[in-house]
Amino acid sequence: MKANHIRILLLVTIAIMFISLMGKWEQTFPADNTKQQTSATQNNSHYDNADSSTNTDVTTTDAKSSLAKETNFSKYDNAKSITINTGVFKDVKVSLLDGAIISASLKDYSISLDDKTPMSLLTDKSGSEYIAKSTIVVNKQPISVNFEDQGIKTENGKQILTLTGSADGLQITRTYTFDDTKYNISVSQNIKNTTSAPVNVIVDDSFARDFDPAGDSFSLLNAHSYTFTGVAYSTAKDSFRKESFKDISKTNGQPTVINSDGQGWVAFLQHYFVSAWIPQSTNAKIYYKNLNGDVFEAGAFTGATIAPNQSENISSILYTGPIIKANLVDLAPNLEKTLDYGMLSFFSEIIFWVMNHIHSLVGNWGLAIILVTCLIKLIFYPLSAKSYRSMAKMRMLQPRIKRLQETYKDDRQALGKKMMELYKEEKVNPLSGCLPMLIQIPIFISLYWVLLESVELRQAPFIFWIHDLSMKDPYFVLPVLMGLSMFLQQKLSPAPADPMQAKVMMFLPVIFTFLFASFPSGLVLYWLTNNLISISQQWIITRHYQATHKK
């Protein structure tokens, strides 16, 4: 390691390899789910013993169970629906056919920079359906309930939609409570048994989504392919687990059921956004499954026995919106873990906390990245200064090193010995400059995940042509400037003794310009800023060292 650019090569190579491995690991092994499987009978439903606590923690049931019935999205095409708008939601459609929420758009999040239409997180659009539904189940069979609209009333800034319906001797009153400023919806069911016998009832809150896992492919040079799409869930025993749609599609339609053990939630995760059902009962069970290739379902169901002429209240919270920690932390234990920064989340959360506070002052995420970089360089300045002084000393030793190379050009063993003697005599450690660079690896990786996973940086502009710091530079200006800064660093650093190595080093700026061209522009901005500060520090320290150590 005789030059700063070699250390940069080490840093970025390790970081890129680590990021790639983590991304591939997340997709290949999203969760270490050790399942206890039971031998299900041919028509065994996963609704069996729904109110019992004696089931195994995880059960895989038969694909021919009642749960595995396909979701018929087309039935909503001509059904009547109620539309609600809030401060954060646009056109929330609740179908009167069964009370499913078949559409919900997010006012503060547009589809793209070019299309300012609010993105539809839940949608009944053909081919990409994604709905949230609450199904009433009697004797392990879903019943069909056609609801009637009882109107919307406003209380304390909240809109409350009430639907009523009846089927199989049950009278059902369902209410949806919308807070004007929040993405969570309270869904409450009052179920009255009008028959003369007890009835075993299940309320199944679930999501159904049409999604092609084959299109969710991994690419080394596509930063956004490292993100996760699939199911996430939490129980009292298991704080956070994930299963990708790709892995679930390999289960041959077999549903998987998990005891919540008193608390839990289940969610569909995608880049930046999450939809989660949070049951409020203590005996809920969580499940997920693949229905017919491209349709996936996940939910939480709660069972109860209702005596004749008695009622039962069962409620849940539905969250469908951006993955923002402040929105999630109070809704349910561990729901904030859907903001997954990976194995270095501790550092990522600190970096985001600092960036967020700086952003609140300057109002620009690009400036926040630059100022965070300056802060990081300030914190690590003592180590960096030591590294640059070491390189300055190595640079002053270059004439003596070249003389040794000429003298012992035919005896590499003797050359190595003389070089070590020279380093010892001058108290120089050629590896001393590596430590500051190695310490930056977790910072580099942590910032990468902050830029990739934080919805706050989605479509966040910087200046001029940079309109989205979470995406690559559309004109590759920042990667080119970053490459030029690397080239300038080479000129300030001691040249490699090996001519072949020197030629290879000449191409490093080009190689890394190509690699960084596909990275989020915010990350390239960080690295460019880091390089420019490093160049300034190195130039000042080198000149000062040379001025004070002239012989």
Curated annotation (Swiss-Prot):
GO MF annotation terms: membrane insertase activity
Q: Which InterPro entries match?
A: Membr_insert_YidC, Membr_insert_YidC_N, YidC/ALB3/OXA1/COX18, YidC/Oxa/ALB_C, YidC_ALB_C, YidC_periplasmic_sf
Which biological process, per GO, is one annotated for this protein? protein transport
Ranges where the record places region Disordered: 33-58
Per UniProt, the keywords (alphabetical) are: Cell inner membrane, Cell membrane, Chaperone, Membrane, Protein transport, Transmembrane, Transmembrane helix, Transport
Ranges of Polar residues composition bias in the record = 33-47
Q: Which Gene3D superfamilies match?
A: 2.70.98.90
Q: Please classify the protein's predominant subcellular localization into one broad category.
A: membrane
Q: What are the GO cellular component annotations?
A: plasma membrane
Is Magnesium there in the keyword field? no
Membrane-traversing stretches:
3-23, 361-381, 431-451, 504-524
- What membrane topology does the annotation report for this chain? Multi-pass membrane protein
Location(s), subcellular: Cell inner membrane
Which purpose does this protein serve, as stated in its record?
A: Required for the insertion and/or proper folding and/or complex formation of integral membrane proteins into the membrane. Involved in integration of membrane proteins that insert both dependently and independently of the Sec translocase complex, as well as at least some lipoproteins. Aids folding of multispanning membrane proteins.
Per UniProt, subunit arrangement is: Interacts with the Sec translocase complex via SecD. Specifically interacts with transmembrane segments of nascent integral membrane proteins during membrane integration.
Q: What is this protein called?
A: Membrane protein insertase YidC
* Origin species: Francisella tularensis subsp. novicida (strain U112)
Gene, per the UniProt record: yidC
